[in-house]
Amino acid sequence: MASLIYRQLLTNSFTVDLSDEIETIGAEKTKNVTVNPGPFAQTGYAPVNWGPGETSNSTTVEPVLDGPYQPIAFSPPSEYYILLSPTVPGVVVECTNTVDRWIATIAIEPNVSKTKRTYTLFGITEQLTVENSYADKWKFIDFLKASTNGSYARYNILLSSTKLCAVAKHTDRLYSYIRETPNAGQAYYAFSHNIFNLTAHCDFYIIPWAQQSLCTQYINTGLPPIQNTRNVVARHLSARSIITRRAQANEDIVVSKTSLWKEMQFNRDITIRFKFANAIIKSGGLGYKWSEISFKPANYQYTYTRDGEEVTAHTTCSVNGVNNFDFFGGSLPTDFGISRYEVLKENSFVYIDYWDDSQAFRNMVYVRSLAADLNTIECTGGTYEFSLPVGQWPAMTGGAVSLRVAGVTLSTQYTDFVSLNSLRFRFRLSVEEPPFSITRTRVSGLYGLPAANPNNGKEYYELAGRFSLISLVPSNDNYQTPIMNSVTVRQDLERQLGELREEFNALSQEIALSQLVDLALLPLDMFSMFSGIKATLDVAKSMATNVMKKFKSSGLATSVSAMTESLSDAASSVSRSNTIRSISSTSSAWTDVSSRVADLDNAASTVSTQTATISRRLRLKEITTQTEGMNFDDISAAVLKIKLDKSAQIAPNTLPDIVTEASEKFIPNRSYRIINNNEAFEAGTDGRFFAYRVDTLEELPFDVQKFANLVTESPVISAIIDFKTLRNLNDNYGISKEQAFNLLRSDPRVLREFINQGNPIIRNRIEQLIMQCKL
């Protein structure tokens, strides 16, 4: 019987599990490889297609030391240091909130005995007593008054060999420096009002508040050498406000355009969030040894707002050029040891692949002029405790590195369902304080970021920046770049399946009934079923596995699996109660309506609904207990075989979907019958039901309780020739009792005789079934 193909797919589904298991083992197999990172070192994570390469760019998002600027009066933003560099003694800077604080800093050169000097402070001439007994250091004195008519009092003093001082407003405080270089530190005044007016009387620099340690370093040790050359010239502060003609962030600009193509420049602000992943593997034995602490690629998906638009982004963080360390506390089994732990240092690289759902990435196919600017970020390691069975636990703690972007390239990541055109940012590393150590061991003072706890309890690291690129896209915005027509493997397959469905449905008119019946009686297996398909012979094994893999998730396979579990539960229920024959518990495996059948008076459903529910399970009963008669699955499998042989568009990649869809959708309106002596019960998936005598075809009242009981005891037969067709055949042609009984059993020999004789009623019924075989 042709329906053997469906039973083979059901019973051989274990090969799918085996195939999946083999693929999983292959995917998880690892190999220890020593990597020597070169100038173009890349990770092996995901296949990539390189674009035009990186474009060098020395622009930084925010300068660490911005200046020098010429003397000026202005209101500096908070969260910034104003680093002042006077060249002559006198008033250096004046700060006020115009309410209760007027602070002036005065510089006194070395070797000045106590004397009175005249200064102009906030427009008023003042005489102040000053002195500096140091021979090699300048003295910076803060004079403060609390009202416009008050007198100045001396406050903080800074002794400096670098001739530098600084002020900064942060929250409700005004910070300055005190003590003596090279050990100068910060002090502050209460500065509670938002107004902050500053007048600088010498050249000055601007440093972000986040670089507090760097500002303190400049105060104590001096500016970098390049700032002390004659080539550095102070500029006016208004230079910071020059309006440039460069494109702003988050804009789409048409660079050039023809009738078919246009070049679009995409400028985007981006927020990159990433995290490290690690693997900590403990060795066997007594629990004192660890075999590996290593970095692993980590995916992270998140959303953020860009110009009022919510953007969904995806990053993958991976590393390369790691340094392998080890530690062995001794040769005893109870001595703590780590066979290998990875550390990121100056020779390492960090790669971050970034993709988001904006228009720029949808058209990132033909690209030029790719550039990116990103801030620097510091990654600090946390603490990881090694839990030993006995004794104090050692802990790996500390370590830090800074990530600075070294280049950006295009990369394309392919999966089974989607192709992501992404940006790959390459970061160079520099080690930072603090060093890492393993407590209660001799390992200490090592620099780098170990893999034990690289995220330090943070969900993610975040850095900001921007990128710009010029992409070649179709002039018509309704079209997309050619590669986007095949953006997913699944999208191509759906298009092929759509064309194939149309062709399949059109082929129904070309099927010969005699050929169909003959083919339905053949015991088709998978290879004879698919032998007519081009290019399947060379890939027969993989093709069969793919068909079974797809068929395993079909509605038919799922229903059979659920039915088997229900039968097992019902059988165990019967075996536990030998004295009671529980028909309802057994029939529930087939009908799912045992509770409704048990008490028809209280049932909310009609008989039609109950029989329709039962009939949906009758196919499962029939397919597991095959009879000699022809069934609906024989016809649907034969139709499928004929159409596969006639189709010009079928291919191995579309075959699994076609077979699965045919098993679920071919002949949706089915009727099944059960014969009990001289009575026949017939129920259809459309809710129709009949009970009639076999010899006279006289209709009888339908007993749904008896029908439900017979389902569990009697074989189920496909009603190829249903009751309506039988009665029509008997009324017009007259049939014998034997012929009627053979048609009720769907005897293929009798069906072939009627078709060969050209009987229009039987022929019309078979043609109706064929026309139902549509996708």
Swiss-Prot record:
GO terms for cellular component: host cell endoplasmic reticulum-Golgi intermediate compartment; host cell plasma membrane; host cell rough endoplasmic reticulum; host cytoskeleton; membrane; viral outer capsid. Residues 247-478 are annotated as: Spike body and stalk (antigen domain). GO terms for biological process: permeabilization of host organelle membrane involved in viral entry into host cell; virion attachment to host cell. Residues 388-408 are annotated as: Hydrophobic. The keyword Protein transport does not apply. Disulfide bonds join C202-C215, C317-C379. The keyword Membrane applies. Residues 65-223 are annotated as: Spike head. Residues 483-510 form a coiled coil. A motif (DGE motif) lies at residues 307-309. The record marks R230, N231, R240, S241, R246, A247 as: Cleavage. Residues 509-775 are annotated as: Spike foot. Keywords: Capsid protein, Coiled coil, Disulfide bond, Hemagglutinin, Host cell membrane, Host cytoplasm, Host cytoskeleton, Host endoplasmic reticulum, Host membrane, Host-virus interaction, Membrane, Outer capsid protein, Viral attachment to host cell, Viral penetration into host cytoplasm, Viral penetration via permeabilization of host membrane, Virion, Virus entry into host cell. It holds the Pfam family VP4_haemagglut. This strain probably does not use sialic acid to attach to the host cell. In group A rotaviruses, VP4 defines the P serotype. Belongs to the rotavirus VP4 family. This is Outer capsid protein VP4.
